[in-house]
Amino acid sequence: MQLDTDYLENIKITKDKLNKISSSMCMAKWFQVSLHLPNGKTHSCFHPPARLVPLTELEQDPGALHNTKHKQVQRQKMLNGERPSECEYCWKIEDAGHLSDRHYRSAEWWAQDGWNEIKNTDTILPRYVEVNFNQACNFKCVYCSPHLSTTWEKEIKEFGPYDLSNIKHNDTQYLDMPFQSSNDDNPYVKAFWNWWPELYKTLKVFRMTGGEPLIDNNTYKILDYVIKNPNTDLELSITSNLCPPDNKIINRFIDKIKKIEQIRWWEDPNKLNKEYNNNNFVGSSCKHFSLFVSLDSVGEQAEYIRYPLDYNMLLDNVNKFLEKTLTTEICFINTFSILSIPKLKDFLQLILDLRIKFGKNTQTILEIQPPDRGEYKHPPVIIKPKQRIWFDIPMLNNPKWMSDVVIAQDKSLLAILDDSLTFMKDNVEQEDYYKTGHGFKKYEIEKLKRNIDIIKQKSLKDEELKNHVELKHFYMYFSEIDKRRKTDFIKTFPELIDFWNIAKADNGS
């Protein structure tokens, strides 16, 4: 309970620190970057649109993957107290009276050594880096697109884009598709590997996304680099669907993580071990490893959203990963759309069940003896029980016909949301949390409440709802999905039948 209170208090303190600089300051614009290397795009945090990195800038400095001229202008705006329009996601939440991701991100531990660097808007080494090396993916999630998934691209090549009255959705002619060259010839991938040794020195968080990272060789190149070049400050993570096409892949991945976890000696001439005042270190190859698992619902509804997910296989792999590794964590990412809501309470129950199964009270304090170094015998490394199950519920912005715009039109969905919020409050962490790790945290409850408030603000009047373009798109899109994939929306989502019929009638069907 105290940990949760301290977390929220830290965010409020960070808000005050940001406001002393300006009312629009955000540390993420300096110290966080998401890189989409297949099509050469970059953005700081996932809310602003990704923008192309000009090759002319990249040729001068591989660090332009983060420090583009455009981003330098946005940083200056923030220092001046202006609100960059590309950050509207946070402005919308703040204007609704809530703390936004601007506050949450700026309060993260990885940003704290950068407060003295923010006056420099030009050349910054990010501390938090997300990278997508490759669009290769064996899934075609309903809210995804061909430029992020080869399976989606294959479907569009076979059937064409989705004709939704006034738009052609997922038309590859208008998407920023990956370069039609091999990964080795991609100038952005080359620039990344040229930048990597310098970037790695100050890196605190590194996250690989996709596509599906587990089927990309760059992922294993990174893991091998970390094994050979340990970094005590590094939080390493991967976002995965955790259902690779071959079981050998999951085994290979787990074996790499087990090697990273191994306790070892090493010397780093560029870093001081403050505890012993020397350059020698003992520990695992990184601070810790987290696996982010994309999962938006449970059972058949999860399989529909993240087609062709095998839900039982995913659960098996979750358990296998947690059982075979010692210090790892899993964070489930529920991309919050209209399809997430019908089984939201069941999703939350899954979180509770896993927190019980892999809770702190099921773990023991480990004493791992490092290998001797000459005649010196190092004391055992102590590994304490930890929280291993996390989740997040970022709201989907696009496509609009799955977003908060349409969610608010179905009162039954609002009732499910309110019931789910009550469920979380009824299962809030108790005083024995330090021993168990069970229950929901206050800030997790606050995030769902925030989502609900935003959704309710989007409610349309009956006359506005009629002929609303997103209703048309909703019906047309999922009707075509069912036709192409031999699925059945109504059978899978019976909770949405009334909404479906309204959307169907709005299409004149």
Where are these regions (language model features)?
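Recognition helices and adjacent regulatory flanks at domain boundaries
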Residues: 98-127, 137-139, 160
